[in-house]
Amino acid sequence: NIGHFLHESKGKPLSPEEVTEAINNEIRCISESNSHSIPPIEHGEALHGAQWGMATCFPQPIAMASMFDSEAVEEIAEVIGKECAVAGVRQALTPVVNVVRDCRWGRTVETFGEDVLLNADMGAAVCRGLQKNGVIATPKHFADNYSYGGRDSNVSNTSERTMREVYLRPFEKCIKEGGAMSVMAAYNSWDGVPCSCNKYLLTDILRNEWGF
């Protein structure tokens, strides 16, 4: 996946200098290999810390949510953003703002739980904190990435009313109040149309209604 930095420790944690060197080499290689010298946007996982060996590791989002303190979460995200930026990572694949209504879902720990407002507040706080350091926030997975029964990325037949009242609201706040500069589409389909090419979600709602 061009543009995705994946930390490989090779048996030991990498220092900031080693991570930066690896990313710079990747950027140089990709830039030199295309006719327009276009560099990639380096992105990486940063759910509860920048993804390299000596970066700060914070609690999982489900634990952060238990603080009910969006200001503290914004400060945490600011630290994560700094540690991403110093290594050359310019896009963080976080926050996960899928509202969990069935804790059998294996990715529940990555979320802020079952409450719509809490998800929205925490997600927007993460977006603001990351982007203070020039790191693009990526709320995901847009939208309704899990289904009842705990099945990951399964077909969603959720009604539009429930989508708008529950599953879309955290994303809306991430865009309007968090200023999120990117969004990751969900892997599943909604109402028979894959979310990654769902015009109603990506154009009518995300762009036209929310102004993304």
Q: Which residues are covered by each model-predicted region?
A:
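Glycoside hydrolase catalytic-domain context in secreted enzymes
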Residues: N1-F212
